């Protein structure tokens, strides 16, 4: 199934304003609650969440977003049951294995951000292969945050900066906010415009701590498997209606 399928159904319904975000980041929350409401296992919820992610990618393509960042697996999620973690890793591998053709077909570049060393060898190799196969794609950049935390990302950036100083490739006095951004996995050349969190919780869960200083935040009670194109449209409409001041006085 292609990402574009059924998107044309929304062509005459969607009526966006000009203020469209370039970079949208989504905290995909609510798979377990969604499954529980239906008397299903959490695993069923995660698999349904995978299809919600495909819809989000389709929406991003159709509306020409430049970057879509999906928070798939927090470093704190290792505290879940071994069985659930096993299912999540298998689902991740399944998605990578089955979506590569679509990624290339629609000119999508995949980038997995996070500490990949904790993944098993098979999954690490699959990530490496898919990233390489989509590296030259110039359309949507799809970031998948897996085994990721914002604090970890900043810590890794600090370590790299220290090494650069020791190697005399960087001067301590030359370090600016822009320098730090350059060492992050997601830099601010295209800043995060909008952060969406599904599932009814109003927190950021250690996601993109550095990058979202000026991002607009949108929280919805909609559970992730139910987050369809209409729900995505609501978030974009809300973003379009907001005045982004960046510290300036309101007009």
Curated annotation (Swiss-Prot):
It is an enzyme of class 2 (transferase). Keywords: Cell shape, Cell wall biogenesis/degradation, Magnesium, Metal-binding, Peptidoglycan synthesis, Transferase. One of its GO terms (cellular component) is cytosol. It catalyses: 8 isopentenyl diphosphate + (2E,6E)-farnesyl diphosphate = di-trans,octa-cis-undecaprenyl diphosphate + 8 diphosphate. InterPro entries: UPP_synth-like, UPP_synth-like_CS, UPP_synth-like_sf. Binds 2 magnesium ions per subunit. Mg(2+) binds at residues 29, 216. SUPFAM superfamilies: Undecaprenyl diphosphate synthase (SSF64005). Transmembrane segments: none annotated. GO terms for molecular function: ditrans,polycis-undecaprenyl-diphosphate synthase [(2E,6E)-farnesyl-diphosphate specific] activity; magnesium ion binding. Its cofactor is Mg(2+). Substrate binds at residues 30-34, 42, 46, 74-76, 78, 80, 197, 203-205. The active site is at residues 29, 77. It comes from the Bacteria. Catalyzes the sequential condensation of isopentenyl diphosphate (IPP) with (2E,6E)-farnesyl diphosphate (E,E-FPP) to yield (2Z,6Z,10Z,14Z,18Z,22Z,26Z,30Z,34E,38E)-undecaprenyl diphosphate (di-trans,octa-cis-UPP). UPP is the precursor of glycosyl carrier lipid in the biosynthesis of bacterial cell wall polysaccharide components such as peptidoglycan and lipopolysaccharide. NCBIfam families: uppS (TIGR00055). This is Ditrans,polycis-undecaprenyl-diphosphate synthase ((2E,6E)-farnesyl-diphosphate specific). It comes from Buchnera aphidicola subsp. Baizongia pistaciae (strain Bp).
């Amino acid at each position: 199934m292609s990402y574009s399928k059924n998107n044309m159904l929304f062509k005459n319904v969607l009526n966006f304003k000009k203020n469209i975000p370039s970079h949208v980041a989504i905290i995909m929350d609510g798979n377990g609650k969604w499954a529980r409401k239906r008397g299903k296992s959490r695993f069923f919820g995660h698999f349904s969440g995978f299809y919600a992610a495909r819809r989000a990618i389709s929406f991003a393509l159709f509306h020409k977003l430049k970057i879509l960042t999906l928070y798939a697996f927090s470093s704190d999620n290792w505290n879940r049951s071994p069985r659930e973690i096993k299912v999540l890793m298998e689902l991740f591998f399944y998605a990578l294995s089955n979506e590569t053709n679509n990624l290339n077909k629609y000119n999508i570049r995949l980038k997995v951000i996070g500490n990949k060393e904790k993944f098993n060898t098979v999954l690490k190799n699959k990530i490496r292969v898919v990233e390489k196969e989509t590296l030259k794609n110039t359309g949507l950049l799809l970031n998948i945050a897996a085994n990721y935390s914002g604090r970890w990302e900043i810590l890794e950036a600090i370590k790299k900066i220290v090494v650069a100083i020791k190697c005399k490739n960087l001067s301590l006095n030359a370090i600016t906010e822009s320098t730090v951004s350059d060492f992050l996995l997601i830099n601010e050349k295209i800043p995060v415009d909008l952060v969406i969190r599904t599932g009814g919780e109003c927190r950021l869960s250690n996601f993109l701590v550095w990058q979202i200083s000026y991002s607009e935040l949108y929280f919805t009670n909609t559970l992730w498997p139910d987050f369809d194109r209409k729900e995505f449209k609501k978030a974009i409409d809300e973003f379009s209606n907001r005045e982004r001041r960046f510290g300036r006085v309101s007009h």
